[in-house]
Structure formats: C-alpha cells, structure tokens
Amino acid sequence: MLTAEEKAAVTGFWGKVKVDEVGAEALGRLLVVYPWTQRFFEHFGDLSSADAVMNNAKVKAHGKKVLBSFSNGMKHLDDLKGTFAQLSELHCDKLHVBPZBFRXXXXXXXXXXXXHHGSEFTPVLQAZFQKVVAGVANALAHRYH
C-alpha cells in the first residue's frame, strides 16, 4: 500500500492535524456536499442549511470522533482491516451505510486537510494521503464483501 517514505510523510503530516477542527469541517462538508448522508444524523438537530450543518455542535463532536478513529488507523497502517473491523460491522450490519459514502467521507477529509494546511498539503502528500483514506474506506466497507 504505502512505502516507508510515504508512511513517514503521512504520519508526520497527520501529527500536525487538529482533529477537532478538521474533523468538524470534514463531516460538515460530507453532510453539505452529499446531503443524502444526513439521514444518519437526523437526531443531530438543525441540518437545514450549510450554515446550520457547519455550526452544529453535534456535527463538530462527531467529526472529531470520526477523525479520532482515523488517527488510530494511522497508527496501524499495515492492518487497516483489523483496526476498523468493529466499525465496519457497525456501519454495515446496524447502520446500513452505503460503502460509497466512505469514499465521499474520504474526499471531504482531503478537502478539509487542504483547507487547513494549505501549501503544506502538496499534491504529492495528497496522493499519499489518498492512499490512506482509500485504505480506510476499503477497510470500513470490508464487511460488505
């Protein structure tokens, strides 16, 4: 999946990420850009507009929770399927999340990382990061296969 150099680059970058800020923005973007994903979060209150979503305290808190899990995955890049096995089971068997939504969440995480880290999030780093988020998305969708 990743070379040793790529692992070092993405884990070094990830160490600088403020998961609360980037997580809030990433989940908010997911819910705004892909509005059908809001069906899983109706209990979060007002999701009626982009502004409402991006300022929703429950969205922000859950975004942090999502990226905390992602951070755990960054520590286990060689065993993403094992690391995300329980979350895969939850999202497949109980929540019935469309596996494509994981890819959409990965795109929102990359956009939020670029928005928060600007020129540091180079195209090369983005390509390396994309390998990780694709691996996480595949691990989360593993239960569907």
UniProtKB/Swiss-Prot annotation:
Q: Which Gene3D superfamilies match?
A: Globins (1.10.490.10)
Residues found modified as S-nitrosocysteine: 92
Q: At what positions is N6-acetyllysine found?
A: 58, 81
For molecular function, the Gene Ontology terms on record are: haptoglobin binding; heme binding; hemoglobin alpha binding; metal ion binding; organic acid binding; oxygen binding; oxygen carrier activity; peroxidase activity
Instruction: Please list the tissues where expression of this protein has been recorded.
Output: Red blood cells.
GO CC annotation: what is one?
A: hemoglobin complex
Q: Which UniProt keywords apply?
A: Acetylation, Heme, Iron, Metal-binding, Oxygen transport, Phosphoprotein, S-nitrosylation, Transport
The Gene Ontology biological process terms listed for this entry are: hydrogen peroxide catabolic process
- Annotated positions of the Phosphothreonine modification: 11
**Family matches, as Pfam families:** Globin
Amino acids binding heme b: 62, 91
Q: List the disulfide bonds.
A: none
For the Globin domain, which residue ranges apply? 1-145
Cite the CDD domains for this sequence: Hb-beta-like
Task performed by this protein? Involved in oxygen transport from the lung to the various peripheral tissues.
Query: Which family does the record claim for this protein?
Result: Belongs to the globin family.
Query: What is noted besides the main data?
Result: This beta chain is termed the B allele, even though it more closely resembles the sheep A allele.
PANTHER family from the entry?
HEMOGLOBIN FAMILY MEMBER, HEMOGLOBIN SUBUNIT BETA
What does the subunit comment say?
A: Heterotetramer of two alpha chains and two beta chains.
Its protein name is Hemoglobin subunit beta
Organism name? Ovis aries musimon
Quote the gene name from the UniProt entry: HBB
